Amino acid sequence: MKIWNKIPIKDNGDKLIAIPSYLKFLDPHPYFHLGAPYKDKTSIWKLREEVVNRLVKVNDYLISKSSFNLLIYDSWRPLEVQEFMFKRAFLLECEKSDIDISFENIKSYPSILKKVEKFWAYPSYDTRFPPPHSTGGALDVCLSDKDGNLIEMGSMVDQMDETSNPYFYANIKNEEAIIWNSRRNLLREIMTKFGFAQHPNEWWHFSYGDQLWAWKNKKANALYGKI
């Protein structure tokens, strides 16, 4: 359980809606492409309505202030998808260490579990502790050029190491690191300008209305639970 999971949830009933098609998406969707159990392609690109409204403003502002577009990497995840991706990440980490294990024995390797949980929320079916993406309030975003091509940010989305920390390059003074840090700063500044909160371990992960957002903004409760 994360520290922000202590925040109570009072879901305000905001609807889960499709993200407008004029925003840029990563295609093909990375998890759907891996076989994650989405109901169908229409259920992939969705968020809570207020989150979508804020995201549109972010994209418009970003375009007006820079040469970049916002590129949406991932959005709402049904719990089944969160479970699929969490298990996959755990088993891949086991393979790297030449450990042959079934997911049912996950607690036998607490160090691997701890590493995975730093980047992937546990797929809890307890409504008090929903994974951020399963609330419809969290999304993963990158910068792209005007043609939708990914801009280098210093690590890949979902890369499970220290380079994914939002501030990893802040004190590294080579030319590439300075560029990557400035791009991460730009993304964070614009997302937070429109009310989003950034995940402490992931430069790409932002949310509005979930428990992480409530914790970072010192709110009494979260606005969104599992949906």
Regions found by a protein language model. Give the residues of each.
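Extracytoplasmic cell-surface/polysaccharide-interacting catalytic and binding patches
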Residues: 1-75, 79-200, 213-227
